[in-house]
């Protein structure tokens, strides 16, 4: 089953969820605000996608961090610690496409998702 990780009020997550619904894709939504960031999943994402892609330096949460907190996130270990503490710095959505589907995607790209589903 497809699992979408993010926060429900994020515009990109809203678009992604609406798109999946329109495409008839069954998915489960994991709300970072209510359920937190599963450390073992984050470790998998870091291995698969890399911390540079996962760390959203363009978002409001990042901009609100003081420079000391931002400096901590200059390597994989520091970025991981920050992501566990401040889930909103994770680029969204993170989507696990299920076993055998080729790992994860970070962010929403309808064209890439269409191709991933074999519909493009």
Predicted regions and their residues:
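Thiol/selenol-based redox catalytic cores and closely related redox-interacting motifs
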Residues: 32-120
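Local sequence-structure signature of Cys/Sec-based thiol-disulfide redox active-site neighborhoods
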Residues: 1-23, 27-35
């Amino acid at each position: 089953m497809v699992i979408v990780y993010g926060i429900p009020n994020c515009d990109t997550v809203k678009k992604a969820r609406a798109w999946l619904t329109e495409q008839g894709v069954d998915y489960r939504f994991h709300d970072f605000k209510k359920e937190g960031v599963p450390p073992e999943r984050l470790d998998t994402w870091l291995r698969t996608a890399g911390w540079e892609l996962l760390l959203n330096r363009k978002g409001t949460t990042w901009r609100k961090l003081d420079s000391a907190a931002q400096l901590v996130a200059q390597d994989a270990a520091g970025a991981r610690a920050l992501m566990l503490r401040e889930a909103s710095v994770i680029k969204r959505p993170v989507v696990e496409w299920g076993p055998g589907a080729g790992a994860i995607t970070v962010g929403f790209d309808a064209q890439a998702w269409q191709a991933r589903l074999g519909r493009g």
